[in-house]
């Protein structure tokens, strides 16, 4: 029988890059898939540009986490991240759990 590794107390943190464009969408999806099934914190503090493709990845991931019964939180969102979400019709307070990242 294979031993199940212990689940860490803290959620893994996926740190978003400064530019989330078409080129970043595939790697972002892969990084999120690597932590699927666990609660996850997505650190959006460094985001300067957010494209529709990466927004689509994030929205899909959030829905997947909801379906899996896991928590998907955007933490420390930059003002650029938040304003672009609103501009693209996906205000952060309507589509994501959001909070500041604990030190």
List each model region and its residues.
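STAS-like cytosolic regulatory interaction modules
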Residues: 1-53, 57-103
